[in-house]
From Swiss-Prot:
Pfam families: DHDPS (PF00701). Catalyzes the condensation of (S)-aspartate-beta-semialdehyde [(S)-ASA] and pyruvate to 4-hydroxy-tetrahydrodipicolinate (HTPA). Belongs to the DapA family. It comes from Streptococcus pneumoniae serotype 4 (strain ATCC BAA-334 / TIGR4). This is 4-hydroxy-tetrahydrodipicolinate synthase. The active site is at Y140 (proton donor/acceptor), K168 (schiff-base intermediate with substrate). SUPFAM superfamilies: Aldolase. Gene3D superfamilies: Aldolase class I. GO terms for molecular function: 4-hydroxy-tetrahydrodipicolinate synthase activity.
Length: 311
């Protein structure tokens, strides 16, 4: 699995990591969560990303998680592994380990956080990772979390690398439009912003790497189908109702809101690991009313987020 398999994926879910109350991974909860996603239009799954609370996972835990999910998925959809850190050497070592582990269409490597590298430093970081193994690399560009932004010009330099096959772009629609217009033919562009998915797909993006697909996969699929069928009136109507739900999902540090909803739905998502904490009970109730029930009064009263949330 690689570029061709991922090209078919419109909705890639950034999978949560289910935890027990003591903070250990709840491997028994994984099968039901996976089957739920696949029943509601998830086309691919990202493991050990931000939504999985990857900063709190050891590499050994990530490998255990990979094995557990691969066993359940059994090749039904492509999988992407989170492989990047702000340490190039550590990223290289883990990318090699994941490549040897097998079963992944690609690895997702984040722009280095905290170090604040230059554009050339970021270019060399990703080039070196991509050179290190035959695992295809997708770049994760999210300046709201990492402080620095990989510019479209640097991204296009990296897009020429044969082992860099795409980007999860969380900057602006202007940057996304530029990348779509100038990218190599076999280079995937996903938005990482659920609220931007409508606009990104209309610009020509390949899909979304999503948190909302844990809970709202059906309406996302319906919206994407309407776009593909050029029914903009229907797609826009879905988007108008979808935006408040996205804002609710990011009204508290993610993935606390989506975990609260999944727990409410009967899935054992469990708590978050520190330094993240669960959403307060009253906030969680209001989030559930918006995302699950589409409660208009709850939306008016409590959900005042933005199209591109901070979290």
């Amino acid at each position: 699995m690689s570029y061709q398999d991922l090209k078919k994926c419109k909705i890639i879910t950034a999978f949560i990591t289910p935890f027990h109350e003591d903070g250990s991974i709840n491997f028994d909860a994984i099968p039901a969560l996976i089957e739920h996603l696949l029943a509601h239009h998830t086309d691919g799954i990202l493991l050990a990303g931000t939504t999985a609370e990857s900063p709190t996972l050891t590499h050994d835990e990530e490998l255990e998680l990979f094995a557990a999910v691969q066993k359940v998925v059994n090749g039904r959809v492509p999988l992407i592994a989170g492989v990047g850190t702000n340490d190039t050497r550590d990223s290289i070592e883990f990318v090699k380990e994941v490549a040897e582990f097998g079963g992944f269409a690609a690895g997702l490597a984040i722009v280095p956080y905290y170090n604040k590298p230059s554009q050339e430093g970021m270019y060399q970081h990703f080039k070196t990772i991509a050179d290190a193994s035959d695992l295809p690399i997708i770049i994760y560009n999210i300046p709201g979390r990492v402080v620095v932004e990989l510019t479209p010009e640097t991204m296009l330099r990296l897009a020429d690398h044969p082992n860099i096959i795409g980007v999860k772009e969380c900057t602006s629609l202007a940057n996304m439009a530029y990348l779509i217009e100038h990218k190599p033919e076999e280079f995937l562009i996903y938005t990482g912003e659920d609220g931007d998915a409508f606009h990104a797909m209309n610009l020509g993006a390949d899909g979304v790497i999503s948190v909302a697909s844990h809970t709202n996969g059906d309406e996302m699929h319906e919206m994407f189908t309407a776009i593909a069928e050029s029914d903009m009136k229907k797609a826009a109507a879905i988007q108008r109702k979808f935006i408040p739900k996205v804002n609710a999902l990011f009204s508290y540090p993610s993935p606390a809101p989506v975990k609260a909803i999944l727990n409410y739905m009967g899935f054992e998502a469990g708590p978050t690991r520190l330094p993240l904490v669960p959403a307060p009970e009253e906030d969680a109730k209001r989030i559930i009313k918006v995302v699950v029930d589409g409660d208009y009064e709850a939306t008016k009263a409590t959900v005042t987020g933005v199209l591109r949330p901070d979290y």
